């Protein structure tokens, strides 16, 4: 089976808008996002009043030079870091202002994350790695594993679910990471250089998979990448430069 082969949806279907979310409400909205860091005794402002909107099912690429603040922006949008100014709304509801415990709950239910390095736990099987967010959510082990198996089938790894990360190829490990990001049926997946550690052929297959899953499941993706060819396949391309986002396409 190729890296881009998807199996039938079966019981797995991601949700984009939660109950009570008005039609047309952006999945993710950042307004006036500002972030500063101390560097060499100086305040460095990496985000300067950034505005960004992501709609349901939309694929948005963020490009820019190394150190321009792309990962910082992704962390702020995902509630992993707090902005110095501005706010983030998730599914039309305040996200930045939530207390950390409540924000963690909302993040677990509405967002997925994929990183350059897969961050899979080496002692656990692919199935148990993917099931972990559902166990954190409070599902029983059998129920969490059933959800995990369904999404592994969706990414073409149903037959590899009992393998540990060390027994999988680089592309397979990243597909497991994508499955883990999707198992909770998030409205949006935030991906930080998800193909950065892969060769060109494998990277292309993983990228194809993410775009196809976005199309078939209606999940929004925000993808930070240095690969302009891959970025060009998204619905929009935004460039982060001098702390501001500029729309390139």
UniProtKB/Swiss-Prot annotation:
GO biological process, one term: protein localization to outer membrane
Alphabetical UniProt keywords: ATP-binding, Cell inner membrane, Cell membrane, Membrane, Nucleotide-binding, Translocase, Transport
Signal peptide: none
Binding site for ATP: 64-71
InterPro entries: AAA+_ATPase, ABC_transporter-like_ATP-bd, ABC_transporter-like_CS, ABC_transpr_LolD-like, MacB-like_ATP-bd, P-loop_NTPase
Annotated region (Disordered), positions in chain: 1-23
Biological role stated in the UniProt entry: Part of the ABC transporter complex LolCDE involved in the translocation of mature outer membrane-directed lipoproteins, from the inner membrane to the periplasmic chaperone, LolA. Responsible for the formation of the LolA-lipoprotein complex in an ATP-dependent manner.
Subunit organization: The complex is composed of two ATP-binding proteins (LolD) and two transmembrane proteins (LolC and LolE).
Name used for this protein in its record: Lipoprotein-releasing system ATP-binding protein LolD
Gene: lolD
